[in-house]
């Protein structure tokens, strides 16, 4: 079977086409601004403007037509309301026009589910992006959140710190590069709050120290990264210990960071569990993960009426009954 998926929860519009074992197309376009940040209205306008050309490109890349598609999936949430509504409207229109079944997909779950295309069975997932930071795993028929940010996502924290340092947006690659030149660790407050995480205190103190002018930016970048990532690894390790699972996956845009990958790999080796990171185009927000998850849901018996496709801006990961996995 072939599924087409449309992703549009935030600033990236993605369209993916997959089978159960292969990505046939995975195209996207990201709204970028000089100062960073996303205005929901601008994201919606971006998605509406690019939907047709991206759909055309995806179909051409896959070498198929809409008639060949068996199921249409879309990101139902969580995300920015105006952006989600553009995507949902497009998915409904395609489903009705071509008489195809439609499936609404939880964006966070899709980030973990796509790893199963590569043979991952039942992992603990660390999902790290601009707006989201979660440690999740399948337990009792739902993806349970074992730890999450209580304030801002790790990606937003990194980007905000980068803006304070005056090194621009996106900040992730630039902070990572600066951190490689760090020579000493500067003490910063832990981001661990029980099983959850809070990056606001860490960010505030790092910015305060920078503004004193007494510290090298390379050392601050190194210290910020080490402190934040240590917290992520600690909470992930606790989830592994609690669940007894033997696989850890790293997904989301911040999965591009090599230091975070290294730290998680060390933890996984110490605990004797497998560690996996998908190709980066399947880590970031993308349509292929929506298509793949929608296909798995459909094959597992999940069915949606058009009336079930209302978007959910605050769609919780643990709301979904996972009957297909």
Swiss-Prot record:
Record GO cellular component, one term: EKC/KEOPS complex
Keywords: Acyltransferase, Cytoplasm, Iron, Metal-binding, Transferase, tRNA processing
Gene expressing this chain: kae1
Quaternary structure, from the entry: Monomer. Component of the KEOPS complex that consists of Kae1, Bud32, Cgi121 and Pcc1; the whole complex dimerizes.
Database matches in PANTHER family: TRNA N6-ADENOSINE THREONYLCARBAMOYLTRANSFERASE
Localization: Cytoplasm
Organism: Thermococcus gammatolerans (strain DSM 15229 / JCM 11827 / EJ3)
Residues the record lists as binding Fe cation: 107, 111, 127, 285
Enzyme's top EC category: transferase
Gene3D superfamilies, sorted: 3.30.420.40
Record protein name field: tRNA N6-adenosine threonylcarbamoyltransferase
Lineage of producing organism: Archaea, Methanobacteriati, Methanobacteriota, Thermococci, Thermococcales
Lineage: superkingdom: Archaea
A matching Pfam family: TsaD
Molecular functions per Gene Ontology: iron ion binding; N(6)-L-threonylcarbamoyladenine synthase activity
Function in brief: Required for the formation of a threonylcarbamoyl group on adenosine at position 37 (t(6)A37) in tRNAs that read codons beginning with adenine. Is a component of the KEOPS complex that is probably involved in the transfer of the threonylcarbamoyl moiety of threonylcarbamoyl-AMP (TC-AMP) to the N6 group of A37. Kae1 likely plays a direct catalytic role in this reaction, but requires other protein(s) of the complex to fulfill this activity.
């Amino acid at each position: 079977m072939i599924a087409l998926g449309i992703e549009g929860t935030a600033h990236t519009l993605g369209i993916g086409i997959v089978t159960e074992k292969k990505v046939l197309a995975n195209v996207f376009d990201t709204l970028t601004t000089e100062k960073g940040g996303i205005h929901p209205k601008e994201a919606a306008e971006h998605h509406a403007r690019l939907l047709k050309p991206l759909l055309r490109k995806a179909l051409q890349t896959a070498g198929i037509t809409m008639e060949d598609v068996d199921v249409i999936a879309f990101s139902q949430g969580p995300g920015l309301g105006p952006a989600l509504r553009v995507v949902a409207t497009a998915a409904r229109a395609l489903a009705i026009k071509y008489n195809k079944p439609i499936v609404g997909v939880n964006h966070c779950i899709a980030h973990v589910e796509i790893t199963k295309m590569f043979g991952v069975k039942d992992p603990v997932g660390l999902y790290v992006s601009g707006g989201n930071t979660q440690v999740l795993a399948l337990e009792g028929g739902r993806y349970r959140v074992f730890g999450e940010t209580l304030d801002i996502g790790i990606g937003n924290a990194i980007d905000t710190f980068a803006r304070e340092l005056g090194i621009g947006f996106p900040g992730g690659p630039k902070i990572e590069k600066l951190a490689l030149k760090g020579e000493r660790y500067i003490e910063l407050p832990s981001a661990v709050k029980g099983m959850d995480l809070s990056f606001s205190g860490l960010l505030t103190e790092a910015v305060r120290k920078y503004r004193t002018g007494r510290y090298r930016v390379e050392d601050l970048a190194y210290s910020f990264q080490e402190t934040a990532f240590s917290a992520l690894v600690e909470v992930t390790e606790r989830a592994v210990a609690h669940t007894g699972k033997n696989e850890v996956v790293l997904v989301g845009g911040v999965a591009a960071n090599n230091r975070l990958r290294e730290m998680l790999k060390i933890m996984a080796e110490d605990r004797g569990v497998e560690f996996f990171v998908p190709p980066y185009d399947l880590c970031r927000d993308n349509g292929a993960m929506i298509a793949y998850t929608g296909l798995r849901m459909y094959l597992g018996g999940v069915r949606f009426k058009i009336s079930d496709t209302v978007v959910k801006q605050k769609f919780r990961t643990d709301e979904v009954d996972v009957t297909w996995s």
